[in-house]
A protein has these predicted regions:
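Low-complexity, intrinsically disordered terminal/linker segments enriched in charged
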Residues: 69, 73, 106-112, 116-126, ...
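Bacterial N-terminal signal peptides that target proteins for export
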Residues: 1-7
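Short, aromatic-enriched amphipathic alpha-helices that serve as compact interaction elements
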Residues: 26-44
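Stable alpha-helical elements in mature extracytoplasmic
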Residues: 27-31, 51, 153
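Surface-exposed patches in mature extracellular/periplasmic domains of secreted proteins
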Residues: 43-52
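Surface-exposed, charged secondary-structure patches
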Residues: 23, 59-121
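N-terminal signal peptide c-region/cleavage motif recognized by signal peptidases
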Residues: 15-16
Length: 155
């Protein structure tokens, strides 16, 4: 085996270990941080709540299907669906920056995480996560004054 082959094989193993660990072995807190890095509605980012492939990277099968159902309703009703706010921010309006993101496990609830952030005020949402073979996925989000996405879309 030449030095080139050994170096190439080493790089493949290191890359696989690094990239695979981030997506499948990340902590729940890292998973939620990645969601907020990806989804920044105050900036010019595309609306991904109609893209099943992207949704399934962050949400479980049931919630993904409900977001797709809501999108289909919006198309039928010309923009009016059951979910009239951004479910990640519990808001309709946004600043360009989200600050003070804090994620903490809920006491005595291993699948619940309190997510606090500042964007046009400070909010705390409660995420229910499920550890799937593909990594962490959001199975629900509880808002201080409203139903969860499941409750809003189903009703």
């Amino acid at each position: 085996m030449t030095l080139r082959h050994a170096l190439f094989i080493s790089l493949v193993f290191i890359s696989t270990a690094c990239f695979g660990a981030e997506t499948k072995k990340s902590s729940p807190e890292d998973f939620i941080r990645a969601l907020y890095r990806f989804h920044q509605p105050g900036k010019d980012t595309p609306d991904w709540f109609a893209d099943k492939q992207t949704l399934s990277k962050y949400f479980d099968k049931e919630l993904t299907a409900l977001f797709i159902k809501n999108y289909e309703c919006e198309k039928r009703e010309q923009g009016v669906g059951n979910l009239d706010f951004d479910p990640i921010y519990d808001a309709q309006d946004f600043e360009k920056e989200t600050t003070n993101l804090r994620i903490a496990p809920a006491p005595d609830e291993p699948d619940l995480f309190n997510v606090t952030f500042t964007n046009l005020g400070t909010r705390t949402l409660v995420y229910r996560l499920t550890n799937t073979p593909s990594g962490w996925r959001i199975s629900d989000i509880k808002y201080p004054e409203e139903l969860s996405p499941k409750g809003n879309i189903v009703t």
